[in-house]
Curated annotation (Swiss-Prot):
This is Probable arabinosyltransferase C. Residues 817-836 are annotated as: Disordered. The keyword Chloroplast does not apply. It is found in: Cell membrane. One of its GO terms (cellular component) is plasma membrane. It comes from Mycobacterium tuberculosis (strain CDC 1551 / Oshkosh). It is a multi-pass membrane protein. Pfam families: Arabino_trans_C, Arabino_trans_N, Arabinose_trans. Its main location: membrane.
Amino acid sequence: MATEAAPPRIAVRLPSTSVRDAGANYRIARYVAVVAGLLGAVLAIATPLLPVNQTTAQLNWPQNGTFASVEAPLIGYVATDLNITVPCQAAAGLAGSQNTGKTVLLSTVPKQAPKAVDRGLLLQRANDDLVLVVRNVPLVTAPLSQVLGPTCQRLTFTAHADRVAAEFVGLVQGPNAEHPGAPLRGERSGYDFRPQIVGVFTDLAGPAPPGLSFSASVDTRYSSSPTPLKMAAMILGVALTGAALVALHILDTADGMRHRRFLPARWWSTGGLDTLVIAVLVWWHFVGANTSDDGYILTMARVSEHAGYMANYYRWFGTPEAPFGWYYDLLALWAHVSTASIWMRLPTLAMALTCWWVISREVIPRLGHAVKTSRAAAWTAAGMFLAVWLPLDNGLRPEPIIALGILLTWCSVERAVATSRLLPVAIACIIGALTLFSGPTGIASIGALLVAIGPLRTILHRRSRRFGVLPLVAPILAAATVTAIPIFRDQTFAGEIQANLLKRAVGPSLKWFDEHIRYERLFMASPDGSIARRFAVLALVLALAVSVAMSLRKGRIPGTAAGPSRRIIGITIISFLAMMFTPTKWTHHFGVFAGLAGSLGALAAVAVTGAAMRSRRNRTVFAAVVVFVLALSFASVNGWWYVSNFGVPWSNSFPKWRWSLTTALLELTVLVLLLAAWFHFVANGDGRRTARPTRFRARLAGIVQSPLAIATWLLVLFEVVSLTQAMISQYPAWSVGRSNLQALAGKTCGLAEDVLVELDPNAGMLAPVTAPLADALGAGLSEAFTPNGIPADVTADPVMERPGDRSFLNDDGLITGSEPGTEGGTTAAPGINGSRARLPYNLDPARTPVLGSWRAGVQVPAMLRSGWYRLPTNEQRDRAPLLVVTAAGRFDSREVRLQWATDEQAAAGHHGGSMEFADVGAAPAWRNLRAPLSAIPSTATQVRLVADDQDLAPQHWIALTPPRIPRVRTLQNVVGAADPLFLDWLVGLAFPCQRPFGHQYGVDETPKWRILPDRFGAEANSPVMDHNGGGPLGITELLMRATTVASYLKDDWFRDWGALQRLTPYYPDAQPADLNLGTVTRSGLWSPAPLRRG
């Protein structure tokens, strides 16, 4: 409808208006509405409290009756309770000189792990004592001689959330103890001292003695399924709610009005604007940038089927996503077909098209005649919608379904107001509740219901005269609560409450008054505050401001329907306020406004037309504000997250083409403001013409009077062209667009087919021409370059802290994401040229000489000219088109060069040319300098390195190894699709063929590899997954040693694509533990123990 219809006058149309006189035809409907509605609501509310079948898991050790280490990394870090009994004679294997290397009788973490003592339990020999250490606390200690004596019987240990206790049964405290003669025992309480468990490890071997026992109750509270009682209640609850809604519909039809079309008559027709919007959305589906959390959500969805529930895979100790996980469950089902990006995001594309259809077919006509008939309104609505959707909603996050849910909730409410019927209200409650629980940002959907309370109360009051209140309210109550059934279908009330309390305690859990952080990020020169995101939000705020201003000044925007337009404005304002209560403050949350942005754009377009805003001065001022918004938006980078940024123009700088765009737009703003001043002081008429304008002049005037439409479509064009240009400029190298288009042909493994892995860098070393291998690196000239001229610690510099990241600090207060194996160190044995530097990437010190310019104390100028190294033949160069030098230090790329020569030139001591290396990596850590072999003439047969360090600052130094030509294989070929991987959450969507490690019954699978994003991404996402947040990094760093493998991006050799790490267990022979499984029925209020929080 174009305008808001007045509710029918029921008292006139229906002579009998009392409840007592209701017709017999509606008496049954009333009874069904009351009974079914109330019972449906009760069953829905009771669903979280009904019992579930929980799968229990017990970790018992020894297994197979032997001292054999086993792996069992608990996703919740700790067991609900732990009981250990160790016969004293079991410690005999630690005594004697023959057992010097054996120190651990039993531990829950490998002793070699850096944080083993801080986090785990170790029963170990320390000098001549046997010590039980629990989370860095020596709980009980006894001399090993007494432990092996005749009086000692056993060591017992128990751990619960409130206390841990241990006792050497048979031993007493010594004469110098606080309580001489008392039992030798220790206890700690007042804190959760339960040790982290990643397995059971021992240095001993052979048969286990009788009485040795380790029993841990694994926390499997979320590994549950509904009991038959709960399943029956849920089915009955849904059926009763459906019956109540049917009864409500029957009561609605008592008004005597004919049935109205569910969809408008022109719903399926398309016009030119529709075609353009469809084309933009479909093309963006292939070439457009994705959101930062797509890999996070895809990995959760892929793992959930095997796990049995939708766990938060990367944080919060494996607690479930519920009550916000139902949308992810749909993605998990969708992933059964394919995990390729174009397939997984197909629902998002469908939501985008549906949003536009709802805006153009439902929203715009309801906003009034002026909006419905204005082409400027339609174009502005389309531009605003696309301007928000493209940068914020082209991924797997829940913002797209929330944006659609808000629109559908509003449309249902408007249909209820227009028809004076209550079934649309019930439907709005269902849609609103599903939207609310799609994600934390779903809280924005409550505005669609709140703004209609007044009209709906009037409808309820009128209809209650005939049917009473309860038959009308009960079905709505059932509709509002029925969403509890899918949300709590396999989980309990107590479990969800504890999970959400844990998330709030662990964080990030920012308060409402921290909302400024979201806007700080919006105005940073980063992907969070990119041109596209900043403009989307600023344009939305501008449209809201002008709509509110015109509504307040004139009562309503001329030509619009007052009720619907006020409600759409009210929803937007409430949504902004509701966003303050989300626990995190990221700019991608603004994606929930995509549908509202299109609706407000239509209103704003009408508000600034000549018919509504007659003053040319005011219209010109509005145009100036629009240009200023553009200028403010272009004062940022055209940046996107991770791989979406590859090849994008101005991705790391402000846009500039001969001159700065933001400066030019600011100057244009001033010119438009001067024009507004001229209209105010000189030509102060209202600009109306008496003569009939020509068709061309009318069209030109319409365009000029639509500055917001022009700006939004310019931004949409800028975004689409930028990402299309990125795909073209990158070709044949990898890009998002190329990968998605190739997926149509069946090549669905994404980046894994283009990342080239160098497993053995020693195989590609170039052979020296004349000098021995050990001396060739310094054979030409070596002044102040020495084999040990490298600091012991070359850890990469950390990035700066960013707003809101304080929740993600590691134990040292830094935000880092360094690549293990590249941070340096020293070795006990010297290498081939006497260097003790620890080399990265599996380089063999016995075959790899090292020279560096650093020295302790005062630095001196240093120069290096290596001997000549033989290049391979031209045919071999074509197969491996890259030359690499592993280097460390802080230096300018001009200070390290590669020179080439023919045999004759080298013999004469001359070179035929030189080039700089591309320095890809983080200083001063070890990294691979790259040079394309195509830049070396085909006649060249030899190369050498030249380094010049004239900077005497202690932090400025150079360390080099000999040149090599990598022998590479694709990551897909090396890692494959079978090995369990630790996929960082930024990379999940780019590697759809790799299998993320799973978890089941509270125990994680042990990964063999880890894939990280680029340096910026690794430093941003690694702290999210660490021990403090209950993520998988807190497990892998205790269980395995990570080593970075050299890798390169095909045809984009100078790109920091990310990193591949090999994960090697500290105990290579440890096998996955066998769990003792069982099933038990638990009530919805049952809790085994508090969840671990620190």
